[in-house]
Amino acid sequence: LRALEVYRETGETISEHDRKSRETPDRYDALYIGLSFRDRQDLRDRIDRRVDVMVEQGLLDEVQALLGSGLPRDATALQAIGFKQFLAVADGTAAVADAVEEVKLRSRQYAKRQLTWLRRNPDIHWILWEKEPDFPQALQNATEFLTAAGVC
């Protein structure tokens, strides 16, 4: 759909449009700061805990409320990680425990894809966190980076 939209608006294929976009110089000199756990297992554990909290705070109720509001089952919102798996629970075609494990798996896979994509950018200043992030240290690290770049 996006490719068709680009073609209609520009008369270019999506690959041509993307190539030209990459060749165009950036308008601004951007600075990038990335946050990452030093140990990947800590990230996985945090994702798993976050999914557990989402379920405890009513993910299934939220899915049922969306369905009750008349949102079509094929709506984009219901295809998101978490909603898609719990839509099956709401339909009675999946068990809660299975849906929880699937949400955890899909979330970890998504996080891995995000980090893989971000790590291709050599301009990102990475702040590595331990199991329990040290926010004051991260702030100091970011401030030092920005100061050295002439921003602060």
Predicted stretch roles:
Residues 25-152:
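Catalytic core of IPPT-family isopentenyl/dimethylallyl transferases
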Residues 1-30:
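Phosphate/Mg2+-binding loops and adjacent switch elements
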